[in-house]
Curated annotation (Swiss-Prot):
EC number: 2.7.8.-
Induction: By heat shock.
Protein name as it appears in the record: Probable cardiolipin synthase YwiE
Catalytic reaction(s) noted: 2 a 1,2-diacyl-sn-glycero-3-phospho-(1'-sn-glycerol) = a cardiolipin + glycerol
Keywords attached to this entry: Cell membrane, Lipid biosynthesis, Lipid metabolism, Membrane, Phospholipid biosynthesis, Phospholipid metabolism, Repeat, Transferase, Transmembrane, Transmembrane helix
One matching Pfam family: PLDc_N
GO cellular component: plasma membrane
Active-site feature positions: 242, 244, 249, 418, 420, 425
Domain of life of the native organism: Bacteria
Compartment(s) of residence: Cell membrane
Membrane topology type: Multi-pass membrane protein
Length: 500
């Protein structure tokens, strides 16, 4: 790793040196020498890019960035654009995960994918093979609406913990909500409960060092995912752990869109109301979610938990359908994009999507438009206001082609909508951490739950319909009348859609 960092550092210094000599030459020889060196480094980067065999869209995007923004663009390319880096850095973890999960699931009796509706059978047949993750039937889930429902439920379950509490979050802040959860962690640790806390170093930069030390002193085992100590020369910098997982005694689990911060309970006056969806899990499915945590924990701490029987004893309950946990990211071969595509393609009646970041790749857009052409009701809901300028306008750039195909687009007005929900035909759904953008599809560690639980899906549908009442339905005519300034912003932002 150190050798690779030094190689990138010296190559970057050479690029800057060549750039300076070219622009401020002392002699004609230095001018042409600097220019030649500068062009050679850029061409070498473009050659490496072409060898990655990515889509033509992404290849051309990065070529343009490297040519027109060479110094800054080269940094972005080295640490976010290189797909082969992902393959090399996480190859060992990917193989290890596959083997550990195979051994874990081989102990279980896998339910047959039979007796399901056509769309359900098609999706789960694909997802089992593609994701290599078991399905469960002896499980159930409860849909939790917003932070006001979710965090009291999480805190109550944590206080009842007897053996262990395992927590994994992308964003965890030292504010009123974060300290409330930390107090429970420290209290349970002092009582002898094992408490392990994994946080993403980039997402949780507002987790105070003094709070980390307080938790450690209380007995909480806490580690960061991908620390930022090497700055831009950390090749793993751009691969972030976007998962949100809580496991209590192997009996109860929580997963969904909510991080830990006061904005997630609508207490940030700048953001205002926060709309999100989370799930409470019970039964065998908790073991699968726990396995994802244990593999992530082992990766950053070197403590092996997944082989210990006490952490791998499923607690079955009476189920209400088919359930599957799917983790994606640099450590997994499959992409959430593939699973979303299969869900959309399986639809026969309706597709309802709620996502905060809508920057779909070509395959997702094609599937949505094809479904609408077949007469499937397609609804896409996004927030009116976004916390990212580029993402907001890049999302809007896709609306004209969707509206033209008869797809209904809703702009959520009440506040910021952060949920990641998809409902197919009213009998197949997904809730989790993955957005519909390139970061979730290519770079982030994500986890979603796919299920057929009729009661949970009815709840999601009711919530979606309530959200529609708080949304503006975009009309093709009205949207096409937007001003030149908005069109320009959308076109500019779309240039970066491949890296958002």
């Amino acid at each position: 790793m150190l050798k690779r960092r030094l190689e990138f550092f010296f190559l970057y210094m050479m690029l800057i040196g060549a750039y300076v000599i070219w622009f401020f030459p002392v002699s004609r020889l230095e001018f042409y020498g600097g220019l030649l060196c500068y062009i050679s480094i850029i061409l070498f980067s473009i050659y490496s890019l072409i060898l990655e065999n990515r889509t033509s869209q992404h290849t051309l995007l990065w070529i343009h960035i490297l040519v027109f923004f060479p110094i800054v663009g080269y940094v972005f390319y080295l640490f976010s654009g290189q797909l082969y880096v992902k393959g090399k850095l996480f190859k060992t973890k990917r193989m290890y995960n596959r083997e550990k999960l195979r051994k874990l699931f081989d102990k279980e009796e896998t339910p047959e994918v039979t007796g399901l509706k056509d769309n359900q059978e098609r999706f789960f047949t694909y997802s089992i093979r593609a994701a290599h993750m078991n399905i469960n039937t002896k499980s159930n889930i409860k849909v939790l609406k917003n932070g006001e429902e979710t965090f009291p439920d999480i805190f109550k379950a944590m206080r009842k913990a007897e053996s262990y509490i395992h927590i994994e979050y992308y964003m965890f802040k030292s504010d009123m909500l974060g300290r409330g959860m930390m107090d429970i962690m420290m209290e349970k640790a002092r009582q002898g409960v094992e408490v392990r806390f994994l946080y993403d170093a980039a997402g949780s930069m507002k987790l105070a060092r003094r709070d980390i030390m307080r938790m450690k002193q209380a007995g909480v085992d806490i580690v960061p995912f991908s620390p930022l100590k090497y700055g831009f020369f950390n090749q793993k910098l751009n691969f972030r752990n976007h998962r949100k997982i809580v496991i209590i005694d192997g009996k109860t689990g929580f997963v969904g869109g909510l991080n830990v911060g006061k904005e997630y309970i609508s207490r940030d006056p700048y953001i205002g109301f926060w709309r999100d969806t989370h799930l409470r899990l019970e039964g065998e499915i908790v073991q699968t979610l726990h396995a994802i945590f244990m593999l992530d924990w082992e990766y950053v701490s070197n403590e092996v938990l997944i082989d210990q029987e006490e952490y791998n004893t499923p607690v079955p309950v009476e189920g209400g359908g088919i359930y599957q946990i799917v983790a994606t990211g640099p450590d997994m071969k499959e992409s959430m994009s593939d699973l979303y595509y299969e869900m959309i393609s399986s639809a026969q009646k309706s597709i309802w999507i709620a996502t905060p970041y809508f920057v779909p790749n070509e395959s997702i857009r094609t599937a949505l438009k094809a479904a609408a052409t077949k007469g499937v009701e397609v609804r896409v809901m996004v927030p009116e206001k976004n916390d990212s300028f580029l993402t907001q306008y890049a999302s809007r750039s896709y609306f004209p082609e969707l509206l033209l195909e008869g797809i209904e687009v809703y702009s959520y007005q009440k506040g910021f909508m952060h949920q990641k929900v998809m409902i197919i035909d009213g009998d197949l759904a997904s809730v989790g951490t993955a957005n519909m953008d390139m970061r979730s599809f290519q770079l982030n560690f994500e986890v979603n739950v796919f299920f057929t639980d009729a009661e949970a899906i009815r709840t999601l549908e009711a919530h979606f319909e309530e959200d529609m009442q708080e949304s503006e339905k975009l009309s093709p005519v009205g949207f096409y009348k937007r001003g030149v300034a908005d069109r320009t912003k959308e076109s500019f932002a779309r240039l970066f859609s491949g890296v958002l």
